[in-house]
């Protein structure tokens, strides 16, 4: 994992087990405010990467006169719309922190498999340099959200189990119009889902720590 990423729970457990009982009891944990700050930064970065890639793909492969039509087609339907996740800031404000974390985790995990195929689709480094970087960043964010859930789980009642939406793999046949539209739709959903995660995390962070310069 890259420097500056989330503390590994396994590493902390191993180190803690090797400490005397008194030292283990006082082993410093990352403050909740830092966990939220790190999660927001990672979500912002991923959302920006997704938005830039979507625009570049659109500019490269989708004729301008087809863009509006394609955005309103079935190819643009996102599986994440089948779960009761908030669609904006106002809706998110009505949900508890644990509910928002569960939605965020489901959205992140739904993309872990598809993004591993990006390098086979965009061999000219169109997407984020390499798909490995995207996968690693998603895993980082997944671990950060799970860390937040562990911190909050004793203080919030458990909600109903959410079914994880499943996205198809990106299609490698870019000369096929159907494949282009499929990938265009997937990138659109990736961008939308990461925007949702970013919004949820910002709502939680602002609600808990009330920064005067808080923007969502």
From Swiss-Prot:
Keywords: Disulfide bond, Hormone, Metal-binding, Secreted, Signal, Zinc. Disulfide bonds join 78-189, 206-214. One of its GO terms (cellular component) is plasma membrane. GO terms for biological process: animal organ development; cellular response to insulin stimulus; growth hormone receptor signaling pathway; negative regulation of apoptotic process; negative regulation of gene expression; oviduct epithelium development; positive regulation of gene expression; positive regulation of multicellular organism growth. InterPro entries: 4_helix_cytokine-like_core (IPR009079), Somatotropin (IPR034975), Somatotropin/Prolactin (IPR001400), Somatotropin_CS (IPR018116). It is found in: Secreted. Residues 1-25 form the signal peptide. Gene3D superfamilies: 1.20.1250.10. The keyword DNA damage does not apply. Zn(2+) binds at residues 45, 198. GO terms for molecular function: growth factor activity; growth hormone receptor binding; hormone activity; metal ion binding; receptor ligand activity. Belongs to the somatotropin/prolactin family. Growth hormone plays an important role in growth control. This is Somatotropin. It comes from Gallus gallus (Chicken).
């Amino acid at each position: 994992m890259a420097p500056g990423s989330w503390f590994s729970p396994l590493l902390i457990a191993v180190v803690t087990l090797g400490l005397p009982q008194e030292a283990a009891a006082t082993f410093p944990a990352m403050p909740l405010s830092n966990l939220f700050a790190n999660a927001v930064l990672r979500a912002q970065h991923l959302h920006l990467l997704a938005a830039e890639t979507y625009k570049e793909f659109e500019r490269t492969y989708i004729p301008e006169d087809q863009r509006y039509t394609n955005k309103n087609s079935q190819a643009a339907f996102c599986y994440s719309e089948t779960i009761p996740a908030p669609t904006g800031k106002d809706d998110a404000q009505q949900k508890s922190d644990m509910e928002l974390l569960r939605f965020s985790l489901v959205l992140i995990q739904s993309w872990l498999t598809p993004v591993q195929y990006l390098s086979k689709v965009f061999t000219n480094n169109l997407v984020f340099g390499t798909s490995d970087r995207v996968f690693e960043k998603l895993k980082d964010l997944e671990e950060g959200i799970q860390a937040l859930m562990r911190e909050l789980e004793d203080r919030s009642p458990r909600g109903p189990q959410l079914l994880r939406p499943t996205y198809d793999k990106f299609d490698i046949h870019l000369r096929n119009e159907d494949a282009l539209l499929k990938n265009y739709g997937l990138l659109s959903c990736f961008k939308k889902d990461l925007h949702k995660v970013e919004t949820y995390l910002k709502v939680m962070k602002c609600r808990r720590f009330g920064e005067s310069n808080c923007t969502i």
